[in-house]
Swiss-Prot record:
Membrane topology (UniProt): Multi-pass membrane protein
Protein name listed in UniProt: ATP-dependent lipid A-core flippase
Residues at which ATP binds: 382-389
Catalytic activity: ATP + H2O + lipid A-core oligosaccharideSide 1 = ADP + phosphate + lipid A-core oligosaccharideSide 2
Subunit-level organization: Homodimer.
Domain ABC transporter: 349-583
A single cellular component GO annotation: plasma membrane
Top-rank taxon: Bacteria
Length: 586
């Protein structure tokens, strides 16, 4: 399959602008506001003509229906300056405010779109990304993109129209001098083109460095207990300093070129201005007031033009950020082509000759076949890396098997609508995840409607009700980030309560009691045994004592099932299972 051609800068920027142009009304108001601002800027300079005429005792020309007597009066210039400045301020307000509204809306909508995309991307995407990079994408990159649209457009509107007004007035006053003045435009354009390539290249590296900073910080903060207990503070500081130094290095390179580009452009502009002033002094043959106005326009044009030269670096930063954002937005969501839905399934699960590998060179499962009848419990045991958790991932379609079939009640899971499939499976794994929400919300997670009575029933079955009621606000107590306010055993019992609340016909327990002490495990085992009644249950266990009553125990090794039978049968064989069992109880 051929790789799609990388979009050009123009194509990328058009796509960026499409997000902003959804707010056309704001754009129009902003454009009008900046148009008024630029027009008043030009008229404030025009007032100089009347000022000089007054100083030299010459009558001023009539304007806007005002007679020469009015324009030559003592109060005309001061009053005009105040009135024009007020109108200019009003224009600037509307221009800036409504362009800011565009930026805020673009940031919000783009963040929502990228997060919505991330939520539905396949698990394989997260296997190759770290959380720091993705957080940086949501925060830093999106702000860079928005800046390249709104800030660049704002500068283009405000300063672009100022330059247009100034040049127009200069052409009206003396078109020959003005044409000579603008001959420097090709030189300025060439300098900006050269710089733009460098800006975009370095901006990519800056964003990568920011992602690494976020990644290191996220890892260190999430694992702060491990960091402290192992004395890893200095190591983490060194890692963070390395990441920030890399960011500083590329940021310095970017600013160095940006800082160098600006004075070079100013020097070129100053040379054009110097030539213009020289020509005015030797060639001007009309009123001195016109010469003053023309020279002021030529000098004043430098400021808005200087702002326009900064658009380049802003846009290049945004385009570099847009590359990473559009790369994620253009990814395919996890496959969900299934149309069938199971209503009240019995829960028969069958795997036939299932093969799967995370990469082509290393197969994780080789020809796995087994069936679990409704109400049965099947346990998977084996060493780490034998393929137990991979089977769980395939059942939930975090990945799709490459060969063979997986069915529920005879229906291939690829034929089922994804949400419907997962609706019928409750998972409790060894990595307990709790959200920074109330205990009740964590137990009822994924449900649109919270049933307080069902929550308490589930908590009681999971042996969690008593400790929850002892918390300051009971079920409304915040769990803290990742359940930080709870012990490991408490977090695991809430996770079990969550599975009980879901009341799905298929239950997966992936080391579900691994975080519990022996006493808590005994207390909860009876609840789990009751939960299993009438449900298809797949158990992955390290503690073999927890699966002695399983209907079938499958022993796995290197992606294959090497033994199968109940507890006593496998012990009598004196094979792999018996060795594992005796090693735990020796």
């Amino acid at each position: 399959m051929s790789t799609p051609a990388k979009p050009t800068s123009v194509e990328s920027y058009k796509r960026l602008l499409s997000y902003a142009f959804k707010y056309k009304a704001y754009f129009i108001i902003s454009f009008i506001g900046f148009g008024v601002f630029a027009a008043m800027e030009a008229q404030l300079i025009n007032i100089l003509e009347y000022f000089v005429d007054r100083l030299e005792g010459r009558p001023s020309a009539p304007v806007l229906g005002l007679s020469a007597d009015v324009t030559s009066s003592l109060w005309f210039v001061p009053i005009s300056v105040v009135v024009l400045s007020i109108i200019r301020g009003i224009g600037a307000y509307f221009g800036n405010f409504y362009m800011s509204l565009v930026g805020l809306n673009v940031i919000t909508n783009l963040r929502r779109q990228i997060f919505s995309q991330m939520i539905y991307l396949p698990q394989s995407f997260y296997d190759t990304k770290n959380s720091g990079e993705l957080i940086s994408l949501l925060v830093y990159n999106i702000e860079q993109v928005t800046g390249s649209v709104t800030n660049a457009v704002k500068t283009l509107f405000r300063d672009g129209m100022s330059v247009a007004w100034f040049l127009a007035m200069m052409l009206i006053i003396n078109w020959k001098l003005t044409l000579a003045f603008i001959c420097v435009a090709p030189v300025l354009g060439g300098l900006m083109y050269i710089a733009s390539k460098y800006f975009r290249k370095v901006s990519h590296k800056i964003q990568s460095a920011v992602g690494r900073v976020s990644h290191v910080a996220t890892e260190s903060i999430q694992g702060i207990k491990l960091v402290k207990s192992y004395g890893g503070e200095k190591y983490e500081l060194d890692r963070f300093n390395d990441a920030t130094n890399q960011n500083l290095h590329y940021g310095t390179k970017f600013e160095r070129v940006s800082a160098f580009q600006t004075p070079v452009l100013h020097i070129v502009l100053a040379l054009a201005l110097a030539v213009t002033f020289y020509l005015i002094m030797i060639l001007w043959d009309s009123d001195s007031s016109k010469a003053v106005v023309y020279a002021t326009y030529a000098a004043a044009i430098a400021k808005p033009f200087r702002q326009l030269t900064k658009i380049n670096s802003i846009i290049q930063k945004g385009l570099a950020a847009a590359d990473t954002i559009f790369e994620v937005l253009d990814l395919q969501a996890e496959p969900n082509s299934g149309q069938q839905k199971l209503n009240a399934p019995k829960g028969r699960v069958e795997l036939k000759d299932v093969h799967f590998g995370y990469n082509q060179d290393t197969p994780a499962l080789n020809g796995i076949s087994f069936a679990i009848e409704p109400g049965q419990t099947v346990a998977l045991v084996g060493s780490s890396g034998s393929g137990k958790s991979t089977i769980v991932s395939l059942l939930l379609r975090f990945y799709d098997n490459q060969q063979g079939s997986i069915t529920i009640d005879g229906t291939p899971i690829q034929s089922l609508e994804l949400h419907n499939l997962r609706e019928h499976i409750a998972l409790v794994n060894q990595q307990t995840i709790l959200f920074n929400d109330t205990i009740a919300a964590n137990i009822a997670y994924g449900s649109e409607h919270i049933d307080e009575a069902r929550i308490q029933d589930a908590a009681k079955q999971a042996n969690a009700h008593d400790f929850i009621m002892a918390l300051p606000n009971g079920y409304q107590t915040p769990a803290g980030e990742d359940g930080s306010r709870l012990s490991g055993g408490q977090r695991q019992r809430i996770a079990i309560a969550r599975a009980l609340y879901k009341n799905a016909p298929i239950l997966i327990l992936d080391e579900a009691t691994s975080a519990l002490d022996n006493e808590s495990e005994k207390q909860i085992q009876s609840a789990l045994d009751e939960l299993k009644q009438g449900r298809t249950t797949l158990v992955i266990a390290h503690r073999l004592s927890t699966i002695e009553n399983a209907d079938t125990i499958l022993v796995m090794d290197n992606g294959r099932i090497v033994e199968a039978g109940n507890h006593q049968t496998l012990l009598d064989r004196s094979g792999v299972y018996a060795n594992l069992y005796h090693s735990q109880f020796s």
